[in-house]
């Protein structure tokens, strides 16, 4: 299927990398983003990287909760499918500000689904998260593993998964794929697009890169008393380009008339500790990272990594990059863009 694709949150980290892959694949791509946690600079760079395909990109600054504005976007283009990345994603912030997360993530998604249905667009790829597995009793996590929202953020992902299942059950014309991805890291090999979180980062690798370029004094290691090989948490880190490719495979799978509502893990199937990841980044950058060991964060699980067999079998997708390539590309992005998409610490 090559057609018109709407990408919500397309100016963000994962969204921008996926938009580039869509353009290179020949898709006409429309991005909507409220730019609360992202920058239009990323979209301009995507356009540049896409070369001649960049002319097939349109951008609207729209909040998904603004139904009239969303209706206008849908009235201008007949979409074949939607990729839904938009949403807030910081576990710690969600614990402190649960209503912000429920309002932003749930209402936005419900509004999107309503407008899609009204315009006869019933194909959706939804960005879920491995956070729905909570603190798993067994690893690797399969798509059938027990689910548990350990934070308001995690619960929004769980709720949206249930909403998607209910929507498809109520109207079998819907085809929905929900992608539970693990820990996205790295950047496009060009060094032109990457992760640029607003404020102090919540995730490991953007935090690491801000320490290395001198924007933060040290890296806080949250929890060093886990029952893992070095006491730090274990995660399944996946290169953002692999993740973007997984979304393209999911989009193509929506051509399957029998898909219904399906869920797939996107990860490498390998667990890496926080300290192992820090060591790999030090090797890639040639820099020493000052560490400060602090207590565990509420809502953080000990060990989480994916079983990827279902995605390999049904989506014909497999992660290609290891942590060395992830850190190499992350450092390439960080060293070329020490202030992200801005030109100074205070610019956006």
From Swiss-Prot:
It catalyses: UDP-alpha-D-glucose = UDP-alpha-D-galactose. The active site is at residue 153. Its cofactor is NAD(+). Its EC number is 5.1.3.2. Optimum temperature is 30 degrees Celsius. It holds the Pfam family GDP_Man_Dehyd. Optimum pH is 7.0-9.0. Belongs to the NAD(P)-dependent epimerase/dehydratase family. This is UDP-glucose 4-epimerase 4. The lineage of its organism: Eukaryota, Viridiplantae, Streptophyta, Embryophyta, Tracheophyta. The gene is UGE4.
